[in-house]
From Swiss-Prot:
Residues 148-180, 201-305 are annotated as: Disordered. It comes from the Eukaryota. The chain crosses the membrane at residues 337-357. This is Fractalkine. Disulfide bonds join 32-58, 36-74. Pfam families: IL8. It is a single-pass type I membrane protein. Residues 148-172, 201-210 have a biased composition (Polar residues). A soluble short 80 kDa form may be released by proteolytic cleavage from the long membrane-anchored form. Belongs to the intercrine delta family.
Length: 395
């Protein structure tokens, strides 16, 4: 009986499937990426970044060295320079991975004192403790104001307290720093010394002569006089300017003509100074301007300490990109598992092929009733199932 074309087709499919499984098993066990046929000569250690072992399926064992330009070279692991290079790379990788490549540095809080603002103040005002009140500062203010009045007619240069305060203000704005609370007393003294006015009797009697003398001296000066200010003790909301700018700098005008005009027009100053007596002291409540938080005038007037805002500065850099070599270890269990799966798949294919062939043969088999009919002692027997040729067999 000759096999049908369908049987040949099934056999051919089984053969191709078997041919596919066998190379797959071979490639699964032999994963050699780098074939080391030629070993390299000595390479400087400074040019190497990592190394790795070649696969066992490559046959010849070698060390694959990678340079800084990401080029790979094969080296003999038995040579001494190769072993030294491996030790150096292992030590370097261990040093990098010891702390994870992350470091944190703490910078101590540095709050520089304001030296320019206190240039025109007495040493006793600078050494005041934090709990100094306005009554303690009043004595210093009177002496400072008397010295300022005495030197105003002879000196062409403005007092150092005003120039120092303006310079320190610009520097503090540029640096973005916040002064400590113990320097509040120096700020208040510098601010109050710029707003001290003469007594009402002197102001009313010699206002015209003083204005003329001031007008003759003002064009030669380069900075505004401490007498020219738009701050008023009765209105603390005008004293507090925008954040980061002191009140005695915000309201000033650099032109002496406009400052003299503001003296004559503004009635608030005349009313306030006429109500004062010659022995009265000035007690304005001016809050020092901070770059982060502005305390209320009530807290400054009562002598309470402003809240400290000190945040540690952490300089944390990103972790370094570590390229730690991970050498692949061949897993024998995985290889055995792959072989078992491949064998089971092949046996399953053979079983399916046998069932298909048996079913085909059973379909092509001839039943007994088709053996033929007897005619005159002869029986017609077909040559094969499904054929139209018969053979006469004597009975």
């Amino acid at each position: 009986m000759a096999p049908s074309p369908l049987a040949w087709l099934l056999r051919l499919a089984a053969f191709f499937h078997l041919c596919t499984l066998l190379p797959g098993q071979h490639l699964g066990m032999t994963k050699c990426e780098i074939m080391c046929d030629k070993m390299t000569s000595r390479i400087p250690v400074a040019l190497l970044i990592r190394y790795q072992l070649n696969q066992e399926s490559c046959g010849k064992r070698a060390i694959v060295l990678e340079t800084t330009q990401h080029r790979r070279f094969c080296a003999d692991p038995k040579e001494k320079w190769v072993q030294d290079a491996m030790k150096h790379l292992d030590h370097q990788a261990a040093a990098l991975t010891k702390n994870g490549g992350k470091f944190e540095k703490r910078v101590d809080n540095v709050t520089p004192g304001i030296t320019l603002a206190t240039r025109g103040l007495s040493p006793s005002a600078l050494t005041k403790p934090e709990s100094a009140t306005l009554e303690d500062l009043a004595l210093e203010l009177t002496t400072i104001s008397q010295e300022a009045r005495g030197t105003m007619g002879t000196s062409q240069e403005p007092p150092a307290a005003v120039t120092g305060s303006s310079l320190s203000t610009s520097e503090a704005q540029d640096a973005g720093l916040t002064a400590k609370p113990q320097s509040i007393g120096s700020f208040e003294a510098a601010d109050i010394s710029t707003t001290v006015w003469p007594s009402p009797a002197v102001y009313q009697s010699g206002s015209s002569s003083w204005a003329e003398e001031k007008a003759t001296e003002s064009p030669s000066t380069t900075a505004p006089s401490p007498q020219v200010s738009t701050t008023s003790p009765s209105t603390p909301e005008e004293n507090v300017g925008s954040e980061g700018q002191p009140p005695w700098v915000q309201g000033q005008d650099l032109s002496p003509e406009k400052s003299l005009g503001s003296e004559e027009i503004n009635p608030v100053h005349t009313d306030n100074f006429q109500e004062r007596g010659p022995g009265n002291t000035v007690h304005p409540s001016v809050a020092p301007i901070s770059s982060e938080e502005t305390p209320s005038p009530e807290l400054v007037a009562s002598g309470s300490q402003a809240p400290k805002i000190e945040e540690p500065i952490h300089a944390t850099a990103d972790p370094q990109k570590l390229s730690v070599l991970i050498t692949p270890v061949p897993d024998t269990q995985a290889a055995t598992r792959r072989q078992a799966v491949g064998l089971l798949a092949f046996l399953g294919l053979l079983f399916c092929l046998g069932v298909a062939m048996f079913a085909y043969q059973s379909l092509q088999g001839c039943p007994r009733k088709m053996a033929g009919e007897m005619v005159e002692g002869l029986r017609y027997v077909p040559r094969s199932c499904g054929s139209n040729s018969y053979v006469l067999v004597p009975v």
